[in-house]
Curated annotation (Swiss-Prot):
Protein name, entry field: 3-isopropylmalate dehydratase small subunit
Catalysis: reaction(s): (2R,3S)-3-isopropylmalate = (2S)-2-isopropylmalate
Oligomeric form and interacting partners: Heterodimer of LeuC and LeuD.
Enzyme Commission numbers on file: 4.2.1.33
Functional description taken from the UniProt entry: Catalyzes the isomerization between 2-isopropylmalate and 3-isopropylmalate, via the formation of 2-isopropylmaleate.
Any Pfam family: Aconitase_C
């Protein structure tokens, strides 16, 4: 995994609450266990007018020119609810999103997001409403996120957010569960060498 310390990107306003994981990546596309290839199916039933995904829905925000290169998603409360599929953050990151900002997230999605190096930022509803107003007035605006300082710069306003210190550390240093384990490889090897032969 790569280090994630700062990110600046165009903001995509998805003005919907309770966006569930089936809306993020419909179940018919969950036929792989690798993380790549899901981006083209992100929000499939909203992005496209046909099952084959060949006719973009011009009314959906991701198909509108100011937002087509977006990498920061702005949403309403309870984002990522529904089933506990890891494919949901995989689809978001494979599409190109690095950050999702919302008043609240479903618990399982929130944890899965960090595992996929997708940063979920929680702000209160008044702050989220102000951000939607800002993006509506300036389509294509970019926000800047600083993971180390836990700040979000949106226009002339700087917001602060809180991350669990361990999750923040893992993002900054590009560590997942495997990377954390490998940091202790020598200690693991020493332990294995001391074990009785019949247990090896």
């Amino acid at each position: 995994m790569t280090e994630f310390t700062r990110h600046t990107g165009i903001v995509v306003p998805l003005d919907a609450a309770n966006v569930d994981t089936d809306a993020i990546i419909p179940k018919q596309f969950l036929q792989k266990v690798t993380r790549s290839g899901f981006g083209r199916h992100l929000f499939h039933d909203w992005r496209f007018l046909d099952e084959a995904g060949e006719r973009p829905n011009p009314a959906f925000v991701l198909n509108q020119p100011p937002f087509q290169q977006g990498s920061i998603l702005l949403a309403r409360e309870n984002f990522g609810c529904g089933s506990s599929r890891e494919h949901a953050p995989w689809a978001l990151t494979d599409y190109g999103f690095r950050v999702v900002i919302a008043p609240s997230f479903a618990d399982i999605f929130y944890g899965n997001a960090f595992n996929s190096q997708l940063l979920p930022i929680i702000l209160d509803e008044a702050q989220i409403a102000a951000l939607f107003t800002l993006v509506s007035a300036s389509p294509g605006i970019a926000f800047s996120v600083d993971v180390e300082q836990q700040t979000l710069q949106a226009g002339d306003t700087r917001y602060t957010f809180t991350l669990d210190p361990f999750r923040r550390h893992c993002l900054i240093h590009g560590l997942d569960s495997i990377g954390l384990t490998l940091r202790h490889a020598s200690a693991i090897d020493d332990y294995e060498a001391r074990r009785p032969a019949f247990l090896r």
